[in-house]
């Protein structure tokens, strides 16, 4: 049990983390070959595919699309100001469309390149793609 009275999720072993780091590098390479800007998480915030390694035992390699700051900021600002969920402003709908289209494109591109991919758990990882391994 952790110091605050609850169990922390188990971390992946060093061997698993090394494998995930290699998988993340191959993921970036495959996306770059397809013409998409791809970056490891240490450069997150840049537009393009942000690839990160989740250190939890049940984690993995995740890819999430990052838009230009102006698009994301416009959507966040509107959400923070309070909006009617039944009538979302155009900026929010556009941001959501971009995220969905790019997630689906990344899924298809990586699958075509020989990766085993799936939509990540939306509750935990939002619109990310979970890269589970390579099939080739």
Name each model feature, range by range.
Residues 90, 95-136:
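Short, compact, well-ordered microdomains
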